[in-house]
């Protein structure tokens, strides 16, 4: 199982993506649910990957830095964890300017259903692509 956290609109909303029992299951969470999500990942002996800005800080309304929290949480429990710089997923999948993550996700992984509003679909698609990308390294 891989947990992929993706910031949305710099407000610290997270799209989670994790592979379970041969499929990929994903959902949308906000920082108040972040610890619960990591507990779930730990319980399933999972791995964690987060895309974050160059400066290493994500601003959230709750004054929580989920990226730093995740790093401390994962290291403290010995869970495999990695950061990915913004843009890495687009480069890894060769996604052109003007093309959305949702379009790429539908092309590469048609079995995954993207639900919600277009913005939510885009964030979820990014989390799915990030999780698949991280599988190579985690």
Feature locations, PLM:
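Phosphate- and other anionic-substrate recognition elements at nucleic-acid/protein interfaces
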Residues: 1-138
């Amino acid at each position: 199982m891989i947990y992929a956290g993706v910031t949305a609109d710099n407000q610290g909303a997270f799209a989670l993506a994790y592979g379970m029992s041969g499929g990929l299951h994903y959902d949308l969470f906000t920082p108040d649910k972040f610890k619960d999500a990591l507990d779930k990942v730990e319980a399933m002996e999972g791995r964690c990957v987060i895309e974050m800005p160059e400066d290493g800080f994500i601003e959230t309304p709750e004054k929580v830095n989920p990226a730093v929290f995740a790093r401390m949480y994962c290291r403290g429990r010995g869970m495999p964890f990695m950061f990915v710089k913004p843009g890495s997923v687009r480069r890894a999948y060769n996604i052109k300017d003007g093309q959305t993550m949702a379009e790429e996700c539908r092309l590469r992984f048609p079995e995954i259903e993207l639900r919600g509003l277009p913005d939510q679909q885009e964030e979820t698609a990014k989390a799915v692509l990030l999780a698949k990308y991280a599988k190579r390294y985690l």
